[in-house]
From Swiss-Prot:
Domain of life from the UniProt record: Eukaryota
Compartments reported by the entry: Secreted
Biological process (GO), any one: positive regulation of muscle contraction
Protein name: Bombesin
Tissues of expression: Expressed by the skin dorsal glands.
Organism: Sanguirana varians (Palawan frog)
Family stated for the protein in its record: Belongs to the bombesin/neuromedin-B/ranatensin family.
Pfam families: Bombesin
Signal peptide: 1-30
Length: 67
């Protein structure tokens, strides 16, 4: 004697898993979009520093923050 037949429960479980998975992906996607904006600013700074200081790429970390 079951309360709900398995035919009605299985699609609800599948729908629940899909919804939870989509929420997890959406939250991760927002983090990656924000991080991409930060990386773009860092790359811009490296290009500007290379033009200003004329330093090779390996030396930019040493020159960052100095004026």
């Amino acid at each position: 004697m079951s309360l709900l037949p398995a035919v009605k429960v299985l699609p609800l479980g599948y729908l629940g898993i899909v919804l939870v998975f989509s929420l997890i992906l959406r939250s991760a996607m927002v983090d990656f979009i924000q991080d991409a904006g930060k990386l773009e600013r860092i790359d811009t700074y490296k290009r500007e520093a290379q033009m200003i200081f004329g330093a090779p790429m390996w030396a930019l970390g040493h020159l960052m923050g100095r004026k």
